[in-house]
Regions:
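Functionalized membrane-embedded alpha-helices
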Residues: 4-26, 48-88
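Interfacial helix-loop-helix junctions of multi-pass membrane proteins
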Residues: 89-116
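Cytosolic-side transmembrane helix boundary signature
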Residues: 120-146
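Internal/C-terminal transmembrane anchor helices
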Residues: 136-163
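Short active-site neighborhood of thiol/selenol oxidoreductases, capturing the structured segment around
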Residues: 193-215, 221, 227, 237
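Structural microenvironment flanking redox-active thiols in thiol-disulfide oxidoreductases
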Residues: 217-251
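Short, internal strand/loop/helix patches
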Residues: 252-277
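Non-catalytic, surface beta->alpha helical segment in thiol-disulfide oxidoreductase systems
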Residues: 274-275, 279-310
Length: 310
């Protein structure tokens, strides 16, 4: 007597899992964007868009499963999607990437192996739901199209891509090259790259080791530096105690970047205190200033490669 309802239960369960997956990604979308960008397959701006397309795609699937509209189509798309993601996760596992795969954003952390098992369980649920029959009611096509539009729009409305927003790009900074060099005199062993600030183009990042947005900003800079093959020209400036610096460098994959730790007074004498603060220095002169959200990849790439003036 209860058999016909079993596929329905699994269908609804699958829908809620898709919704949960999309919502957790949306909640931690900054992390998800940087995760996608870290593969170096897309530009920073394209990573913003692609992250929201994935979230919107999962949101649409969740809504379609729950509403039972065009179930067979949703079922096929889901099966191919899970197969594709499982192949991708297997690739990550093969190359030794054990980072959080962001299947549930930063809320529930799963490495590729965990996520493969999760996908296999999901595929079993799909198979068990196969006997479900699509709902037949009026205006199916209109509702179908509406759900797609709503699902794809929500991520962009809730969290618009940073490159779609307008930011005040005025250069407001307290950085003074001479005072900064004076601060360096307090160090016995100063990295060579800090001593050549007046001679070369440098990107200097004022960050805190305990600031999550600082970590995400530096992860973006790390990818840009890798693309420009210019690690030596990225300088990290921390303040306070050194105890959390190593974990920061590990997490952001920036152990190759030169860094120093200023005293708190010296740090805030050189920065506005709005961290992360990223400065482009042309022979010691600040020509651009960025926070976390207004980083412009193409400008920094051009600056590091000295191809054009920005």
């Amino acid at each position: 007597m209860f058999k016909p309802i079993i596929p329905t239960i699994f269908r609804i369960l699958i829908g809620f899992v898709f919704l949960f997956s999309s919502i957790t990604k949306l909640i931690s979308i900054d992390v998800f964007e940087v995760y996608i960008y870290g593969f170096e397959w897309l530009s920073l701006n394209a990573s913003y868009i692609f992250a929201r397309l994935i979230i919107g795609f999962e949101l649409v699937l969740g809504l379609l499963f729950i509403s039972n509209i065009y179930f067979r189509l949703s079922w096929l798309v889901s099966m191919f999607t899970l197969a594709g993601f499982t192949i991708f996760l297997s690739y990550l596992l093969f190359i030794g990437n054990n980072d959080n795969c962001n299947c549930f954003g930063d809320i529930i952390q799963l490495n590729p192996l965990n996520s493969i098992f999760k996908n296999l369980l999901f595929i079993i649920l799909l198979i068990l739901s196969f006997r479900n029959k699509s709902g037949t009611f009026k205006f199916r096509k209109i509702i179908f199209i509406s759900l797609i539009i709503i699902g794809l729009a929500i991520p962009n409305i809730v969290s618009p891509p940073d490159n779609f927003l307008q930011y005040d790009r005025k250069i407001e900074t307290k950085f003074d090259i001479d005072k900064f060099n004076t601060s360096l005199n307090n160090f016995v062993d100063v990295p060579e790259s800090f001593l050549t600030i007046k001679k070369q183009n440098k990107v200097i990042c004022f960050v805190s080791s305990q600031c999550n947005f600082c970590k995400l900003a530096v992860k973006k800079i790390e990818v840009i530096a890798k693309k420009a093959e210019s690690n030596d020209n990225i300088l990290l400036v921390f303040f306070g105690e050194p105890e959390n610096i190593n974990s920061f460098l590990d997490e952001t994959n920036t152990k190759e970047f030169n860094h120093i730790i200023l005293s708190v007074p010296d740090f805030f004498e050189q920065s506005t205190g709005k961290i992360p603060e990223i400065l482009l220095l042309d022979k010691g002169n600040v020509i651009k200033r960025y926070g976390y959200r207004d980083i412009v990849e193409k400008d920094i790439l051009s600056f590091l490669s000295s191809e054009i003036d920005i």
